[in-house]
Amino acid sequence: MDKGKAGRRRSSAEIVTEGKRKKPSSSELHKITKILNAKPEDVHVQSPLSKLRSSEHWDVSLQGWKRSLRNKVLSLDHKSKKGVRGHPVTSKISPERQLKVMLTNVLWTDLGRKFRKTLPRNDANLCDANKVQSDSLPSTSVDSLETCQKLEPLHQSLNLSERIPRVILTNVLGTKLGRKYIKTSSVTEANLGDTDNLQSEQLSSSSDGSLESCQNLNPHKNFFLSESSSQSSKTDNYAKQTSYTKEKRRDDDGISFMSDTQPKDLSSGSRDCDHLEVGSRNKDDTNSVSRMEPTLISRKRKKRLRSNLPDTHNPASLYKSAEQTKEQENDPAVFTELEKSSENYHEDPKLFEEVTYESIESDFAQLPSDCGQELALSASPQMTSGCSAMETFESSISSDTVGNSTLVVKDENELNTIEKPVLSEHSEGNLSFISAEPIVVSSDEEGPTEQKSSEILKLQPKQDDAISHESESTSEPVVSELPLITCESVQTSSELCSYNPVMENISCLIPKNEMDLQLDFIFTSVYIGKIKGASKGCVTFTTKYIKIPFQVSVHEISLLVDTTHLKRFGLWKNKDDDHSKKSHAILFLWVSSNYLQEIQTQLENSVFSQQSKSTEFIFLELHSSISQREELKLKDIMTEISTTNGELELSYPLSWVQALPLFQNLSSKESSFIHYYCASTCSFPAATTEEMKMKSVSQPSNTDTAKPTYTLLQKQSSGCYSLSITSNPDEEWREVRHTGPVQKLIVYPPPPTKGGLGVTNEDLECLEEGEFLNDVIIDFYLKYLILEKASDELVERSHIFSSFFYKCLTRKENNLTEDNPNLSMAQRRHKRVRTWTRHINIFNKDYIFVPVNESSHWYLAVICFPWLEEVVYEDFPQTIPQYSQAEESHHDSRTIDNDLHTSSALSSGTEDSQSPEMNVTVPKKMCKRPCILILDSLKAASIQNTVQNLREYLEVEWEVKRKTHREFSKTNMVDLCPKVPKQDNSSDCGVYLLQYVESFFKDPIVNFELPIHLEKWFPRHVIKTKREDIRELILKLHLQQQKGSSS
């Protein structure tokens, strides 16, 4: 030991090497014995040691410990001989003295002496004792753990310190790789010498025992120890039970330990415990977790990281803090504060985390590989499967991922995403100790590695063969599961960061060719022969197979295409070949014809009725555009396949123009790709044929078109022309309007009936979806309904006005054109339409239908019983199947809600007086009520104006026909708005008007007792087909009238 420097504070207990030991003085031992005799019940030396399985863990008996302690342990009063900074103090034992742990120097071998000589002594505060502390922190076993746990009072620990056994550590630098590490581990910082490098990079592996030995010492023993012991005490009992197996394997190799009574040793051991604790406590802390991942960092990055560390992370500053602790231990006031703070740490774990977070994080970054390996083997003894998974993971990653556990911020989130699923199934029940991502490293014994880096330290400690075999035996299942877990994360993060350690891990597990030559695409649809399948995952391209998961109807199929039967492929992107506006890209695969039977077998023989040429072609509609990187990788895969199969043409993709002749002759019935995809996008010639039967009309063609945009194919058969029109590959289908002369298709009713209505080919255009029906179609179908659909009895009782009637009634005219300016407004309106009823008396009818168009919206007004002046109840006719009778019996007890309009909510006094009497007889009677029904599919019209105009018209018409005056008011001619089926768009109002009339004729309303419910008058699907039904009716009548005229 260096004792020549004056003023330098001597260590509290010097380590004597090579058998030189200073025996404690007899006076001091006498004082210790006196203290122990004062409270003998507090000291039970044999009690904690009797619980240990010494025969299983220790080769040295308890007597050997005593003998070794007497021969080689220094006196405990050594520190009292020289105080802080050279000031002498009395040798009296202070009750505030901390527990000092002594470590035996393990550098007794030739290599250890050489190692001591190579360490420069450029720091006055670092001595040989510090080197020994840093070089030989022990791998603690359960025996030493339980011994240290029971050291509670200070005088007990002083007396028991003589009985603590020495543990000799095997030097892990005895291998060739260790000597190489010594040469390459120097750091150029001024305040970090080789001693600090050894201290930071070669801390010996701390197991659960070393953790618990630190946490169970009293908090007032050491400031650093109190911080780490507050949180780790929760895992003592659980770790004790499961660390037996691992410790036995280490002890078989002759690894042992010994505790010293030096404060700085405890601080170093406490720091190691902090390493372990942070990994277990901060499970959700991404910064701490990221530092526990195995990564490869360059020397420059490691230097930059160390230069950014605060002063508290410097070993020199740690030594200074240890000095301050030694100064404070002689000051009772300071000691009291430290003890209180230590107790607070035990009481408030959150406060402990806040205080120690920074220093613990930095210490984790300096854990060496061999310490990480020991941690991976012993940090999770509570669960065998968790430990096995971590050991196999480290053996799988091997040496390429061993290094200082530091990550740049860019990689942290990605690695957390990858690592957590691997450990999630093992993390239950290990909330206090096992973190989500413990440090995982690899040793040289667990597997040979071919790639080695000079920047990475790979120590090879002497381990039991059983550990290696255990790692190898348990590595196989985890290795097989690793690519499945990490494949997706690697693929998504490969473009985000320049370095991904998990990608290198997979490269160690999967052959390089198989890993590189695999590509996944997200697709939306697959077209194989006659079927179209929806995507159920990603299509996978490899050199051996192509996997296509898809679903047809309710059947899920995973098609595996053997690449040995692949003939050609194609990749058609929208920007290169503008054949498609629907998808970004199409992948085309052409398989050999002798492979169709295998495809049909995989499709369970339920898809194809027979084999066809179209089955050879597989089209994959990709979800998004393909990147240049993916395109190059796909070409590499195809090149490899072509080399294997001996088909050189396979390495060259087919363009759209080259592939088109292969399937252009297929019909839409044979190929689903042509039917579903190309019919709306590319539409090749002769592939997507849509036949249109038209009348043979010779018309001059326009020959001065600059550039044709479509292809026209003509065929004449049986006096009709069959036309096939397809757009060019770079064009879309566009709606073609008729541009020829207007042609009258039908006259309904046909001659010789008078009042026939003509329908032309222009009128058919309004029957397209989304178009408003014009007045010609409205009038035609209303005439058709009353002449063809209504019963004779109902025809006699009904009258339908033309769609122009209400328009003429409400038309505004110039006052100069009026013959008699003294006429009222109602009389003027009636005069405009007086000739509409010259051959009919509407007051002899029960139902008068008036189509109304306001602001391009169609609705229906039905004038019911205009000849009645009040409500009349009659018996139901026996011959009429009553829709309203059944409805009335169901709704007779309901109250009047929205059916009676607000303007006519009050009925006459006679009605009110009769209602209570007639409620009982309503099921046996039918009600005839004079009213105006408004059947509106939107309720968007000005109903009040319409109803008032119709009342005024009826009043004038009554005077003209009956030659008497009658008032049509809100009381005797009420307006009702029953609930009817409503439209779900903005263009079907005319269709609903026609359906209201048709439903009325089919199932008329004969009972007008309120309320009137017509919500289920007809189903909605009737409206969906009504336009097409009217079109077919017109064309059918057109053919009938054509045949009649020709004959």
Curated annotation (Swiss-Prot):
- Top EC class per UniProt? hydrolase
Q: What is an example of a GO molecular function annotated in this UniProt entry?
A: SUMO-specific endopeptidase activity
Q: Where is the composition biased (Low complexity)?
A: 198-213
Q: Where in the cell is it found?
A: Cytoplasm
* Location of the region described as Protease in the Swiss-Prot/TrEMBL record: 757-1047
Region called Disordered, residue ranges = 1-30, 193-331, 440-474, 883-918
Q: Which UniProt keywords apply?
A: Cytoplasm, Hydrolase, Immunity, Innate immunity, Phosphoprotein, Protease, Thiol protease, Ubl conjugation pathway
Q: Where is the composition biased (Basic residues)?
A: 1-10
Q: What is this protein called?
A: Sentrin-specific protease 7
The record's active-site residues are: 857, 936, 989
Q: Is Zinc one of the keywords UniProt gives this record? A: no
Spell out the family assignment given in the record's similarity comment.
Answer: Belongs to the peptidase C48 family.
**Gene3D superfamilies the UniProt entry points to:** Adenoviral Proteinase, Chain A
Annotated source species? Bos taurus (Bovine)
UniProt signal peptide? none
Q: Which GO terms describe its biological process?
A: antiviral innate immune response; protein desumoylation; proteolysis
